[in-house]
Amino acid sequence: MRQDILVPFVTYPDANTDALVDRAIAVATFLGRDIHAVALEVDIPDVSNLVSRLLIGLPDMIRRTEADSRARGAALLGAIEAAATRAGIRFAGESASAEPALFGDRAAELARYHDLSVVGLSASNDSARMVAEGIVFGSGRPALLVPEAAPPGAFDRIAIAWDGSRVAARAVTDAQPFLERAGEIVVLTVTDDKPLADAGLGTRLAAGLAARGLTARAVSALRGNRPIAAALQADAAAHGAGLLVMGGYGHSRLRDFVLGGATEGVLSEPTMSVLLSH
């Protein structure tokens, strides 16, 4: 059975950049997967009244905004289709519309039909973050978060943020296609962030991976006074990893996500590719 990756492009108010195209092609090539891209276009409800129509022309403003969103989506779909063709990757594309506040929900619905989503993040793109949160916590599928502003990293060495938790174990399972292709796996355990059930839990995971024929080693790290997300990403990079695998902590409270510290950090300030799974 062929597997594929979903690449959701946000188009409003800011669009993803062509960097996401390059990252998605690299992931599909590494995993040998097809690409299914979707342009998330804005659908703005017309709540105008007579005064707003006469004074500011609100319906016309809405139509222009939606047209701009569709144009950005078409450009991104065209770019990734052309790149996929050059790389010999099977491609399918579509557009989907949603109200701005529902981009995350729409993306989660779409992601359920694909094996992995590749989501581009940047510090100023709140819609992209909404999509990432929606997919991680609402789709039941893993998401690969790629910072559009950072240089792409190779996946030949992968770090696992390991604390022995359920979500970390889920992330390791979801990352198997990457782990099986990696030259080395670094099991990274931060020992001064929170109580750990077992001082040797990193060594135990590394041994389990090695028993499956993978090259793995366990390392310990100290958070110190750094935010936990910054510590994990920096230490993973220091060990030569181009991908960090970690579990996503969070739950929905009245539609607002309450996130764990590491999860919040990688969504807010990603410095490397992170496979996040809930």
Q: Language-model segments: what does each one mean?
A:
Residues 17-20, 103, 128, 168-171, ...:
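Amphipathic coiled-coil/heptad-repeat helices and related helical stalk/stem segments
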Residues 21, 26, 30, 105-152, ...:
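Gly/Ser-rich helix-loop-strand patches that form or flank binding pockets
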Residues 36-38, 94, 118, 144, ...:
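Hydrophobic/aromatic beta-strand patches that form the interior of the parallel beta-sheet core
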Residues 75-83, 204, 208:
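Amphipathic alpha-helical segments that form well-ordered structural scaffolds
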Residues 97-101, 123-125, 165-166:
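Short beta->alpha connector loops
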